[in-house]
């Protein structure tokens, strides 16, 4: 890649240049933002790395001026500054920066941070794929026995997390092992049944000052998502309350709506499940990830089958790069589980084929289903898709597996 580095500090300029060229990149440097604004349009770099506090024109002004030029719309801009305030981070985003890295420069993590910010990718990682309750034992080793948690990484954005089942403990461990000045994430709760919220207290980043965490979830009529989370942590149930979290924590109740966070858009849809349950569609730069759990798709022969709802759901997930969806039961298991709020293979395959998604990921497995059972369920789903003439790629992701889009 071709980088254009702007900084009036010669030591910082030299270090950034050394790190970037050492990784095989081409680097152009300027000690003045005025000179940079003059030269960048002609040089067309892939990425500009700019300091903030410079004379005549600061880094925010430079970012704003560059973003006003349509021919530079695809160019990445990363702000590199000793200012660690949240205000400045937000201001950089408002001006059009793709990311913000703080000084002093960490030689061990700088290139990783740059890579995450400038690489146009979305990474989906599975931390828990079972439903209802965690299941330990050898029979669950391949797919894992933790309950729902999926993370989505978007370069330059806070981490997006879907549900807080027991799998979030593994995500917590990963975050705590990664050196960072601060950690930010947005957590989206599908609904407040235990297997989707009861591991919130074990997400260690919540306890660290300087971290910023937002928790979104469906409004339950007279129960806010904040109250639902905090109630399970009252003293008779758990020894730590939400008041002891050190991170800056914000709760937000959701209905069917659209949320926009810079380049990321999150749409919501109410699902067929006891209580209020939301499905989510995360879209960014022409790609999308749909997280649809828990959800019951009744058989077409059942009087409760709602063709309008199925079509509406198909429209919601249409063309998704990956559909992560409740496939709790094999078809022969479903008749005794009707009205439990979960779906079976044939209806999930029909939804994926109807919506022409690119990938179907089976999720929220029944706790009684072992690795061998999930293998059979995957085989049945692939056969069902083939019978429908669908080219949808179908997988059953295991804990720790990741997909890059």
Predicted segments — roles?
Residues 105-114:
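C-terminal output helix
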Residues 29-47:
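Acidic, metal-coordinating helix/loop segments flanking the phosphotransfer/catalytic sites
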Residues 13, 55-56, 73, 85, ...:
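The feature encodes the CheY-like receiver
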Residues 120-293, 298-303, 313-314, 371-405:
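Binuclear metal-dependent hydrolase catalytic cores
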Residues 298-392:
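Cap/insert and terminal regions of metallo-dependent hydrolase folds
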Residues 14-22:
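Charged docking surfaces used in two-component/phosphorelay signaling
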